[in-house]
Swiss-Prot record:
This is Farnesyl pyrophosphate synthase. Its main location: cytoplasm. Its cofactor is Mg(2+). GO terms for molecular function: (2E,6E)-farnesyl diphosphate synthase activity; dimethylallyltranstransferase activity; metal ion binding.
Length: 353
């Protein structure tokens, strides 16, 4: 398959995935929309789903489907099993939506995926907390509806619950490392940064979609999952460093969001690298300006990052990390096809959104 054919196939898969969303909404809402007691709440759920689950890149959800198609022999890929793979892919997207709606409130974010954050919409506000919980609850309703009779049902339930817990522990580390209104640069170490990323991003963004497909394909051995986890945790760190870079140096018209890591006092890759390179005077500039909403102070921090040439440091990191990933995939992917991991790595390498 040449580059254009691959792109066409990917776009077709993406279209199929997006089309399945209407089925997801139907299963979650259709029966109860006219319910005399909870009809209004179900209409709200439908609105929450349609606003918050759509509009992303769908990488996590599509990864489930693509990995399932690679791991399951073609004769076992009937219409029903593909429906289940699409649904589990959407469960990963709903988990992502649950995290993003919550995260945007905690970070006082303004935009997400090129539109105003859900909680910022008139009449929504902190009711969005309950909406986020509805998104999470929808995952388990879908898994029960589509997968209850499957041998992997319990493994999927445990995987989603574990993914939520890991991510929430990561978010706790993130919030504790950077409490609002209190800047302590001593907390921003590489060790703490790696811990936050491992728990907050890598597990649900990379291991969850691949592990879900593995369970659906009947691959449930500890060794296979441990090897996949090793590769995917490394990939998750690579992805988060990119995210931190794009938060400040990305183009909001491409990324779909306006970054706030400096204002939010975040333990981001950029601030960790800045501290490793800064002179005492430069550290003082960071002390005086980091973690504050004033646009002039934010601009001073950005100027400091530019003076330390953190953009070049990022490009070097991206190259080194990609090469490290390739060797790790060669060493650890068996018995899974290396292509599963390489396709994922190539999808995020040099991404700009």
């Amino acid at each position: 398959m040449n580059g254009n054919q691959k792109l066409d196939a990917y776009n077709q898969e993406k279209q199929n995935f997006i089309q399945h969303f209407s089925q997801i909404v139907k299963v979650l809402t259709e029966k109860e929309l006219g319910h005399p007691e909870i009809g209004d709440a179900i209409a709200r759920l439908k609105e929450v789903l349609e606003y918050n689950a759509l509009g992303g890149k769908y990488n996590r959800g599509l990864t489930v489907v693509q990995a399932f198609q690679e791991l399951v022999e073609p004769k076992k890929q009937d219409a029903e099993s593909l429906q289940r793979a699409l649904t589990v892919g959407w469960c990963v997207e709903l988990l992502q939506a649950f995290f993003l709606v919550s995260d945007d409130i905690m970070d006082s974010s303004l935009t997400r995926r090129g539109q105003i954050c859900w909680y910022q919409k008139p009449g929504i506000g902190l009711d969005a907390i309950n909406d986020a919980l509805l998104l999470e609850a929808s995952i388990y309703r879908l898994l029960k509806f589509y997968c209850r009779e499957q041998p992997y049902y319990l493994n999927l339930l445990e995987l989603f619950l574990q993914s939520s817990y890991q991510t929430e522990i990561g978010q706790t580390l993130d919030l504790m490392t950077a409490p609002q209104g209190h800047v302590d640069l001593g907390r921003y170490t590489e060790k703490r940064y790696k811990s936050i990323v491992k728990y907050k991003t890598a597990f649900y963004s990379f291991y969850l979609p691949i592990a879900a497909a593995m369970y659906m394909a009947g691959i449930d051995g500890e060794k296979e999952h441990a090897n996949a986890l090793k590769i995917l945790m490394e990939m998750g760190e690579f992805f988060q460093v990119q995210d931190d870079y794009l938060d400040l140096f990305g183009d909001p018209s491409v990324t779909g969001k306006v970054g706030t890591d400096i204002q939010d006092n975040k333990c981001s890759w950029l601030v960790v690298q800045c501290l490793l390179r800064a002179s005492p005077q430069q550290r003082q500039i960071l002390e005086e300006n980091y973690g504050q909403k004033d646009p002039e102070k934010v601009a001073r921090v950005k100027a400091l990052y530019e003076a330390l040439d953190l953009q070049s440091a990022f490009f070097k990191y991206e190259e080194d990390s990609y090469n490290r990933l390739k060797s790790l995939i060669e060493q650890c992917s068996a018995p899974l096809p290396p292509s599963i991991f390489m396709e994922l790595a190539n999808k995020i390498y040099k991404r700009r959104k």
